[in-house]
Amino acid sequence: VGYEKLEHPVQRRILAEVERWTGVAAADLGLGVDGCTAVSVALPLRAMALAYARFGVSGDPSAVRLRAAVAAHPVMIAGEGRLCTDLLVATGGTAFAKLGADGVYCAMLPQAGLGLALKVEDGDMRSLTPALVALLRAIGDRVPLGFDPARLPESVSAACRAGDGEYARGRDGLASLGGASAVFGLALRRPAPGDNQEGT
């Protein structure tokens, strides 16, 4: 049995870790197969945000080691010019965000004890970066984050790409087809009774 199969011990360990950080019982996890043939887990946004919040403040040696590795090598997370890397660099490794598939972005803000999870309903990946930056700025206006979200780029690239991944070209060379920005309101709620778990 290959390691990517659900019954392999590696996948069982992964599911146990997902349960540990999200608080969702392994039996209740939605399971599928991703583009790499490995098991993929479906979670509610709240569970994703909770996992990132818990991981961001955990003193568990493995969490500390992983956070230190990410802070030391931010380019390995996504690459130059990508928000996942830019956020790590701009915050000295204290804040971390990771792009997911189908319009998902999650972030941990350890100095504020927060985790974030975004999902663009139609799976549009282009709108995620401006949405996350706008959300960080809105939260930063209300809660100290340990960094200045106003210094983050609104969009990593304002140029729209054609369907084949190449930039659209006009007579005068590279042409920008427009940009993206987020427009929404943010209402923070006070934790309800029972929400006061570590990292919520």
Give the ranges of each region predicted by the language model:
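Active-site-proximal helix/loop microenvironment
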Residues: 1-61
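Structured C-terminal helix/loop/strand segments within mature extracytoplasmic catalytic/sensor domains
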Residues: 57-200
